[in-house]
Amino acid sequence: NCSFGQNVYIGKAKIGNFVKVQNNVSIYDNIIIEDYVFCGPSMVFTNVYNPRSAINRKNEYKHTIIRYGATLGANCTLVCGIEIGTFSFIAAGALVNRNVKPYALIAGTPARQIGWMSTYGERVDVPLSGNEEWECPHTGEIYKLEGEDLKRLI
């Protein structure tokens, strides 16, 4: 039930259902991609934190986890050993070197959180921290910001 573009390499990785991988993406060993993840064209997963040509570090591959429904934009780079949260959204060209919260909108080099995204892919109109609620105009889902964490109310 997955879709893979041209020039896609898959190592010993675990890939869920309904994942869409665009052209020119390499998915190395120890990467876990949960269901409904989107990997944009030419996005990059790294597998060794401190590579050197003269040193074999194949036994040092770090685990990277991409949670359910996340979007990884075109040409973004994920440094190995991190977790990308459920329904988070990584902007095109971002360099991500730390864990990402669920529903977070991440952009820049190095990447930082600039907002929140809904499951529909709509920007959630709440600040990065505080106590607020927002209703998605497309789905009617309610999102609640509690401190620095956003939750979808079911």
Regions found by a protein language model. Give the residues of each.
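Internal alpha/beta core interface subdomains
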Residues: T86-F89, L95, Y143
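C-terminal segments of enzyme domains that contribute to small-molecule binding surfaces
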Residues: V44-C80, T109-I154
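Conserved catalytic segment of ABC-fold P-loop ATPases
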Residues: G85-S88, K101-Y103
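Conserved sequence/active-site signature of Rossmann-fold short-chain dehydrogenase/reductase
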Residues: V44, L95-V96
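HATPase_c (GHKL) ATP-binding subdomain of two-component histidine kinases
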Residues: R98, A107
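Flexible, glycine/small-residue-enriched loop-and-beta-strand segment within the central core
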Residues: N1-I84
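Conserved G/P- and acidic residue-centered "switch" motifs that form tight phosphate/ATP-binding loops
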Residues: I90, G108
